[in-house]
Amino acid sequence: MSVKIVHAADFHLDSAFGALSAEQARQRRRESRELLTRLSNYVNQNGVDLVLLAGDLFDSDTTYRETLEALSEALGAMQARVFIAPGNHDPYSAKSPYATLSWPENVHVFTSKTVERVELPELQCAVYGAAFTAPVQDESLLAGFRAPEDDFIHLMVLHGDISATESRYDPLTKGQIKESGIDYLALGHTHQFGGFLREGQTTYAYSGCPEGRGFDELGEKGILTGTVERGKAELSFVPFARRRYEVLNVDVTGRSAENALRAALPDATVRDIYRIIFTGETDERGLDLKSIEEQFAPDFFHLELRDETRIGEDVWARAQEDSLRGLFLRELRTKFDVASSDDERAKISLAARFGLAALDGCDL
């Protein structure tokens, strides 16, 4: 016998989206609520038995009422049992939405740091979980746990951190996972899907977040789904994000920034959020970022441009001129040659551009 599950985590509902305009941020929050409905439809259309939500559904303890209502409605519409393990951003407390909201009957919220077992005899399955009850959890919630040796399929949902033993966010170890006797461990906290891993008989994974919220959450985001049986889990990653965050480096050496950017862009970007970093060499005028942004902004949901170019060698060659320009360039080139970092060299190049523009009576 097997059960079909969906594993998701780290929704961070009602995030601020501070890098976007106020209207774009409002739209992204609306889309985050719409994500819940899309997830509910996916669960029902694909015959899912169990939904495991591994914490940080909320970004903070300040959540819009319409978001709570949308979440409750979406989860209640799922023709599946739903299990939630609160995380460090949304710990369980008497004042948290997990305690104050009237949740649908098919939703179970784990409320204690002690692992709880919920039996589902009709599925021959047991679901285990535990909760953050404060923003930090110094000790592993999995320490000392082992599932009984019975005929049930054993699933667990936790918010925790395997990456560092000194973590303050439920520091899990591979040894604890191996000794747990769990068939599938659904984890939250890390926002990047890192593949399916195995310790002993336990398959475990981080689903990552279903939608990126910033340039530290790049690329495709989604959920995990598949089947679990005794000692075996077969799941796959399902892309679910409406928009992606991407960072693109564009070398402008020997060509205009506009042509270089056109050549580097993929076909479809209008739904996505991009940071373009221009690199390489330019002439003394540098880049007109405002003009580039005006030209390309309609091709994106949001566009951010960064100039990390440097003055070309042909400009520095003019340091040999017997003029004020030459003297200025010689002074800066001396500093440029002994600079200890790319960031310092970039600042010197920028100073050279502004200085040359001032000498020529031009604006940048």
Task: Map each language-model feature to its residues.
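N-terminal active-site segment of His-dependent metallophosphoesterases
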Residues: 1-70, 347, 353-356, 360-364
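Acidic/glycine-enriched edge-of-secondary-structure segments
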Residues: 20-31, 126-131, 242-255
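Glycine-rich phosphate-binding loop signature in dinucleotide/nucleotide-binding domains
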Residues: 43-47, 121, 149-150, 267-269
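Short loop/turn motifs at secondary-structure junctions
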Residues: 47-48, 124, 181, 270-272, ...
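His/Asp/Glu-rich metal-coordinating catalytic cores
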Residues: 50, 59-205, 209-220
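Accessory, non-catalytic peripheral segments of nucleic-acid enzymes
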Residues: 230-364
